[in-house]
């Protein structure tokens, strides 16, 4: 992944952004609907998330899916 796309991800998902899991391709994935807090974006574009259930699995760009939680 190029640096421009990684920077876009960092802008779209800044540290402390709340997200909800829509899909994760991993047998040990948190349940769909689990919420978490973004703690960063790594050099390959994976979202580093601290899931509310204690999981630390990363969200893989182009494979897994999360949505930002927009506070109203």
Which residues fall in each region the model found?
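Basic/aromatic-rich interaction segments and small domains that mediate binding to polyanionic partners
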Residues: 1-72
